[in-house]
């Protein structure tokens, strides 16, 4: 009985790990598609830079330190610009 239970749990763990790895591989392949131009990524970066600059200006007018503000997606507001963290 114990051996059967251990075998079932082992198979379930392997299945979960395999599924997770397959999902990561699929996500990476979608990101690395040849047809996806770099201009789309540049547009996102420019949008984050703009959002951060506006946020910093609002905070400066309120006499707060701009460096405390964090941008979304791994970006940080520093010196009135968005920088990758």
Swiss-Prot record:
Disulfide bonds join 52-66, 56-77, 71-82. GO terms for cellular component: extracellular region; host cell postsynaptic membrane. It is found in: Secreted. Residues 23-48 form a propeptide. Expressed by the venom gland. Residues 1-22 form the signal peptide. Transmembrane segments: none annotated. Keywords: Disulfide bond, Neurotoxin, Postsynaptic neurotoxin, Secreted, Signal, Toxin. GO terms for molecular function: toxin activity. Belongs to the neurotoxin 12 (Hwtx-2) family. 02 (Hwtx-2) subfamily. Postsynaptic neurotoxin. This is U4-theraphotoxin-Hhn1t. It comes from Cyriopagopus hainanus.
């Amino acid at each position: 009985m114990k051996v059967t239970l251990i075998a079932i749990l082992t198979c379930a763990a392997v299945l979960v790990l395999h599924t997770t790895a397959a999902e990561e591989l699929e996500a990476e392949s979608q990101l690395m598609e040849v047809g996806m131009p770099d201009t789309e990524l540049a547009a996102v970066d420019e949008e984050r830079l703009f959002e951060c600059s506006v946020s910093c200006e609002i905070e400066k007018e309120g006499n707060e330190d701009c460096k405390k503000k964090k941008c979304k997606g791994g970006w940080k507001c520093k010196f009135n610009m968005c920088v990758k963290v």
